[in-house]
A protein has these predicted regions:
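N-terminal secretory signal peptides that target proteins for export/translocation
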Residues: 1-14
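C-terminal motif of bacterial Sec signal peptides marking the signal peptidase cleavage site
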Residues: 28-30
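Bacterial signal peptide processing site
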Residues: 32-34
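Metal-dependent phosphoesterase/phosphodiesterase active-site architecture
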Residues: 37-118, 122-137, 141-171, 178-179, ...
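Active-site neighborhood of phospho(di)ester-bond hydrolases with catalytic His/Asp-centered motifs
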Residues: 126-128, 178-185, 234, 239-244, ...
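Active-site-proximal segments of metal-dependent phosphoesterases and phosphodiesterases across multiple
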Residues: 152, 361-376, 380-429
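Core catalytic region of metal-dependent phosphoesterases/phosphodiesterases
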Residues: 154-266, 271
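Active-site environment of divalent metal-dependent phosphoester hydrolases
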Residues: 188-190, 245-251, 363-364, 399-404, ...
């Protein structure tokens, strides 16, 4: 583990390797550019495939267990914890041909042809549920098979590979992404170090995914899950919503209270969960096969950076994260008021408004909710956008159908408000760890699309690229393209994808039907082309703004990889 808080031009001896520790901040501390370049080059970084690809070109598909292997699963002789046996038993992935965009005209029944002069209004990266894991934390719940992920220790690597892949797409395009939005569940255990790793993946720098003491289960740099590695960052403005994993113990096992905060910084397995059938468990960081420890008498080296963050601390950390934009949507007034919802104009100077909601309920459940104060605020934001004839994108961690029945404001009331605001075109969500599309409409012709994006923590480990295209004939086309991380075959992120596909075969997740057999249906909600009839006043207002890009990146870049 790198010495925390030390950024200099000196050499730190870590026992296994000499590192010159100079991340991006070193340029601000008086280090020369050559010193910085030398420092960063001394930290391994993980490469991508030779050629970029999206799910238009090829998709990773999980292997279905054979009848013999399924019998072993059923009788308990092959369990989800025996991940070293996954490949031997045929679990993993294979590549298949990509899937085209599936066109939907439900919100544009009279749409005939694309415009002859098209404008790209927004080029967006959507990320969901990275759930970065500190696998050595004593408050992990890996004794519960639904919580356990055989590649959990590789979540920093997967998220960085996802960002690295997106960065290559952005750099290959004629313009960078206008912005990125993470739709919640930034961390898995709500810990400070997990959030720090996620932020570094987005901003660039050195990620040291080790905690406790300096572990090096496989001697040498860049070859095991605890080795530091270099993140290149997205180089686009990014925003974030909160999810249940950011405000509850492992997403739903109790509040973040003083007992949990003390236990997280301790050295013994936490056994204080109120859930009688849920068992603690964490990964021993000195084991090459990342073995899970279930014995509460075994010591895991303590680490103060494992502190589970309060909502105020979480918002302050995001505000102070650096990178663009300043505050990432949050203000100091928001933080003081514990207000985790906001609105922004993510495409500078253009009439596109993004409203980011806080659908979490830190006191009750992992499901979604909304209070009366936020609902009133949302109503005012929508009225303001209508008055200014703006396009509106709504973001929340939970879909409307994932709200719980004790929410102060019901999902139906939120839906009714959004669906009667005719300039709302999209509701972007996460939480369910799969791709879904839901048409929210009043009469079958007016409404918006609710899109849930799959997680980067679980198979298929994808993000989404969205592009809003004005056809200049009264219609908007929304291109939705899924992108799996393009990790080179020998990288740890590539290994994580194999492990995630293996877990999928066991069906041990929180989501009904989340098995290999479900995959055939999952693909149908991946690449989409959504046609939307624009309100006349919004369409006219868009024409008042000049210098929209005329290159449609989805056509000219993504489809040509």
């Amino acid at each position: 583990m790198l010495n925390r808080g030390t950024v200099s031009c000196g050499v730190i001896h870590m026992g296994r390797l000499f590192y010159i520790v100079v991340a991006l901040a070193s340029l601000q501390s008086g280090c020369s550019s050559s010193d910085s370049d030398s420092a960063l080059s001394s930290v391994p970084e993980y490469g991508l495939s030779e050629n970029p690809y999206t799910s238009l070109q090829q998709v990773w598909v999980p292997n279905e267990p054979s009848a013999e292997v399924r019998a072993m699963m059923d009788d308990g002789t092959f369990t989800v914890y025996q991940h070293p046996q996954y490949a031997k038993n045929g679990l993993g992935t294979r590549l298949e041909e990509g899937v085209p965009w599936i066109e939907h005209r439900e919100l544009a029944p009279d749409f005939l042809v694309q415009g002859t002069q098209r404008s790209s209004l927004a080029y967006i990266l959507v990320l969901a549920d990275p759930q970065i894991i500190d696998e050595e934390s004593p408050i992990r719940m890996d004794g519960y098979a639904n919580v356990y992920r055989p590649g959990g220790q590789l979540t920093p690597h997967v998220f960085e590979a996802t960002i690295r892949t997106a960065r290559r797409i952005s750099d290959t395009s004629s313009r960078p992404f206008d912005f990125a939005i993470i739709v919640g569940d930034l961390t898995d255990t709500s810990q400070k170090n997990e959030l720090d790793w996620m932020i570094t993946a987005l901003n660039g720098g050195v990620i040291d995914p080790d905690s406790g003491i300096d572990d090096d289960p496989i001697p040498g740099p860049g070859n095991d899950y605890n080795d530091p590695f270099l993140a290149i960052g997205i180089e686009s403005p990014w925003y974030a919503a909160l999810g249940n994993h950011d405000v509850l113990h492992v997403g739903g096992f109790g509040a973040i209270d003083s007992t949990l905060r003390d236990a997280a910084r301790g050295d013994r397995l936490f056994t204080g969960s109120n859930f009688s059938k849920v068992w603690g468990g964490y990964v021993a960081g000195d084991t090459a096969d990342h073995e899970v420890v279930f014995d509460a008498s075994v010591i895991t080296p303590a680490d103060p950076d494992r502190l589970p963050l309060s909502e105020t601390e979480l918002l302050q950390t995001l505000y102070d994260a650096g990178g663009a934009p300043a505050g990432h949507g949050f203000s100091l007034d928001d933080i003081a008021a514990q207000k985790a919802y906001y609105s922004v104009y993510p495409v500078a100077g253009k009439p596109i408004k993004m409203i980011v909601l806080d659908s979490t309920d830190a006191a009750v459940t992992s499901l979604g909710s909304m209070g009366k104060m936020q609902f009133s605020w949302l109503h005012e934001e929508l009225l303001g956008a209508a008055d200014k004839r703006e396009l509106v994108i709504v973001v929340s961690h939970h879909r409307l159908e994932d709200f719980h029945d004790k929410s102060e404001v019901s999902a139906q009331r939120v839906r009714d408000l959004l669906v009667t605001s005719d300039n709302v075109i999209l509701h972007l969500t996460g939480h369910g760890h799969r791709d879904t599309k839901m048409l929210q409409t009043v009469n079958g012709e007016e409404g918006f699309w609710e899109l849930m994006t799959t997680s980067t923590i679980d198979f298929p480990m994808q993000s989404r690229v969205l592009e809003l295209v004005d056809e200049h004939n009264g219609y908007l086309s929304i291109y939705v393209t899924n992108v799996g991380h393009n990790s080179a075959a020998t990288t740890l992120a590539s290994k994580a994808r194999q492990l995630a596909a293996g877990k999928l075969a066991f069906g041990t997740t929180f989501f009904d039907g989340d098995t290999v057999a479900f995959w055939a249906e999952e693909v149908k909600a991946q690449n989409l082309l959504l046609r939307v009839a624009l309100p006349e006043d919004v369409s006219r207002n868009l024409e008042n703004f000049s210098d929209w890009p005329d290159t449609v990146e989805s056509i000219d870049t993504l489809s040509h990889f």
